[in-house]
């Protein structure tokens, strides 16, 4: 009897251990170098409207062509929107943090204490568009396909530090690392997951025009290579109430129409063939956005303030060349460039002088030193005048 009781207790302990590993002990988010913004149990991202109505059609433009419904190849072109609308990943990156991910297809993960492996756990309700449950076998198949010689080489480079992969059970999969890599457990969460049924009887590196079987919020409704593609919101989408999807993907249909070049595309927009255009060319913005539909209000021309990193545009010195290794030469050329005249006469006063490689973000350098910069300069015995001149010399 004592043996039977002990055995039952052992079974109970094992069951509880499995439950703990798959449930409460698994990490739900990843943030590199800081605490994640969203707590476990968050309802939705702050940048979405959870009350958004789901209806309507939006018509967009794309340029060039497409020839395959496989977005994971180097040699063929896939249609606009395919990766973002049809395929999904284990984790979902948030758009209001520098580098954070939250469980999406995966409910969570466990990073080994030695940092040499990570185990991901797949949500029980995660399904593909054909209704099949997503399993660890699908994750392994997707990963193995993407790092093969026939896929785009970027994937082999991206996950080069993965030594091996082991399926633990139907919903658990373990990735073993070659060496410690502080980002690897996060970028494993970026693996796009698709069903092996999509590729049955096909060569992955050949042109594939069969509609993908994946887990995203949209499925392909209709398409004509090089002409258009229309995505339809999946009415049976598994993640519609997941916090990583609430308030997102609200259009019933998203259609991309293809144009051979920007000039033709802009004229098509002005004629009302699609609904939205983003312009980054100062001359076109200043001279070409006019016509009857602008006058009658059918088209609204707006400049919207945003907080996205704008990057940098300019002349970059190749300091491997001897002439540019002299700092004073580089500084003299910088002074010789008349930005004010160029902006007025070439760029229609549309540009602002870049002051940082991280323009329009909290990481950018300010013209005036911050309080912390002043304190650091004082601590290092650097005169404040030098700190100010250092900043100003970049833009003057």
What are these regions (language model features)?
Residues 27-29, 55-64, 107, 117-120, ...:
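Short, well-ordered beta-strand elements
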Residues 38, 48-53, 75-82, 108-152, ...:
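Aromatic- and charge-enriched surface segment that lines or borders ligand/interaction sites
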Residues 26-114, 121, 144, 213:
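N-terminal lobe/hinge region of extracytoplasmic solute-binding protein
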């Amino acid at each position: 009897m004592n043996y039977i009781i002990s055995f039952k207790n052992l079974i109970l302990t094992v069951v509880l251990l499995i439950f703990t590993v798959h449930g409460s002990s698994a990490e739900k988010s990843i943030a590199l170098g800081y605490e994640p913004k969203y707590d476990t149990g968050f309802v939705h991202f702050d940048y979405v409207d959870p009350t958004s109505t789901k209806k309507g059609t939006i018509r967009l433009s794309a340029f060039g062509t497409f020839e395959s419904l496989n977005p994971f190849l180097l040699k063929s072109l896939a249609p606009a929107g395919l990766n973002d609308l049809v395929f999904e990943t284990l984790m979902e990156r948030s758009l209001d943090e520098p580098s954070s991910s939250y469980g999406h297809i995966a409910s969570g993960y466990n990073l080994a204490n030695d940092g040499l492996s990570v185990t991901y756990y797949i949500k029980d309700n995660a399904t593909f568009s054909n209704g099949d449950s997503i399993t660890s076998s699908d994750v392994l198949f997707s990963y193995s396909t993407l790092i093969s010689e026939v896929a785009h080489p970027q994937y082999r480079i991206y996950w080069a530090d993965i030594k091996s992969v082991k399926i633990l059970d139907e919903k658990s999969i373990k990735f073993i690392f070659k060496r410690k890599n502080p980002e690897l457990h996060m970028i494993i969460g970026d693996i796009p997951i698709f069903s092996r049924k999509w590729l049955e009887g096909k060569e992955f590196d050949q042109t594939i025009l069969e509609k993908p079987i994946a887990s995203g919020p949209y499925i392909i409704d209709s398409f004509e290579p090089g002409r258009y593609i229309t995505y339809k919101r999946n009415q049976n989408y598994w993640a519609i109430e997941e916090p990583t999807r609430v308030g997102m993907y609200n259009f019933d249909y998203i259609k991309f129409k293809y144009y051979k070049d920007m000039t033709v595309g802009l004229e098509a927009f002005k004629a009302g063939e699609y609904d939205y255009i983003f312009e980054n060319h100062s001359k076109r913005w200043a001279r070409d956005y006019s016509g009857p539909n602008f006058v009658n209000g059918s088209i609204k021309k707006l400049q919207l303030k945003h907080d996205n990193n704008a990057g940098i545009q300019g002349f970059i010195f190749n300091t491997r060349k001897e002439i540019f290794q002299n700092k004073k030469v580089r500084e003299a050329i910088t002074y010789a460039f008349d930005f004010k005249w160029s902006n007025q006469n070439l760029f229609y006063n549309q540009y602002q002088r870049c002051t940082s490689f991280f323009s329009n973000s909290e990481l950018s350098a300010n013209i005036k030193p911050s309080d912390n910069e002043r304190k650091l300069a004082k601590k290092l015995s650097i005169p404040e005048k030098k700190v100010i001149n250092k900043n100003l010399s970049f833009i003057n």
